[in-house]
Design a protein with these regions (language model features):
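Alpha-helical transmembrane segments and their immediate juxtamembrane cytosolic regions
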Residues: 1-281
Length: 281
């Protein structure tokens, strides 16, 4: 079986998602967590925009979208309920219908904002490209960009930076080239990544820094993983990369459950034992 570079990228990204939501990691390495948070979900959104297929019937696309929305609603509702009982970051104080509806459709909660953004951008993408069928690709792209900007500017449901990276992924998709033909795997790309990571004020670069970090990451990660000669390891990496959605949906449950095991690893100041526990789950 041939493993796709996108699977490698998504595997590393989903592992980072799990890692930064481990409370012990956040406590031990706050600067590392902040750095990862600065760019990695934007890289994920770029890949998501690239992978979305709008060459589907309305029924097929609705089915695809509901496979995101239904689990999203279930998990957000559950997460919100648990947050009223346990000390969960970004939780809600009351479990009432208005608060839950606002959480599901407007603000989202915890890590599930990604699925919220994914669904909104995907619906706008599909509708703008299919309702104006006779328009040129450039015309459709401009219309798509306009709607993304309007929604992000005049509603609270979409972040403009996140929308921009999803849009970038769509643009790369429309080039009709493989992603690794556009963002070529190269170890050289680790240099700007390390350079920005070493700058104490890298956040002052804002969108430019996020863009460089995301593109550099998507370039050097496949090259690093390609150097692994063990086919079994590559198979596991590819499998994880192809199954990021269920991992993303359920990883808060793993991290919450992992808190109960923290006392067992009080001797481990590095936090390594806790991380191993979460990944074994």
């Amino acid at each position: 079986m041939k493993y796709n570079n996108i699977d490698y990228q998504r595997c590393v990204l989903i592992c980072m998602v799990v890692m930064i939501h481990i409370v012990n990691f956040s406590t031990l390495y706050p600067d590392v967590k902040n750095f990862i948070n600065f760019f990695f979900m934007q890289a994920f959104l770029l890949i998501t925009g690239y992978l979305v297929n709008i060459r589907k019937t309305y029924k097929e696309f609705a089915s695809y979208t509901m496979k995101i929305i239904i689990p999203y609603i279930i998990m957000v509702t559950s997460y919100a309920f648990v947050s009223t009982l346990l000390p969960v970051r970004d939780g809600v104080n009351e479990f009432t219908i208005p608060i839950i509806l606002n959480t599901i459709f407007v603000t989202s909660i915890g890590p599930y904002w990604f699925l919220h953004t994914m669904a909104i951008c995907g619906i706008i993408y599909y509708l703008t490209f299919n309702l104006v069928g006779k328009w040129s690709i450039m015309g459709k792209l401009c219309l798509f960009a306009t709607f993304l900007m309007l929604v992000s500017q005049y509603t609270p449901v979409l972040n403009s930076t996140n929308a921009a990276f999803y849009f970038t992924g769509v643009c790369l998709r429309l080039s009709e080239k493989r992603l690794d033909e556009i963002i070529k795997p190269s170890l050289w790309s680790i240099l700007p990544f390390i350079a920005i990571a070493s700058f104490p004020n890298y956040k002052n670069w804002n969108f430019l820094a996020v863009t460089i970090l995301a593109l550099s990451f998507l370039s050097f990660v496949p090259k690093l993983i390609q150097s692994i000669n063990n086919k079994k390891v590559l198979g596991i990496i590819g499998f994880i990369g192809r199954n990021t959605l269920p991992i993303y949906l359920f990883h808060p449950i793993f991290t919450m459950g992992g808190k109960l095991a923290l006392p067992l690893f009080h001797f481990d100041n590095s936090g390594g034992g806790t991380y191993g526990l979460h990944y074994c789950r």
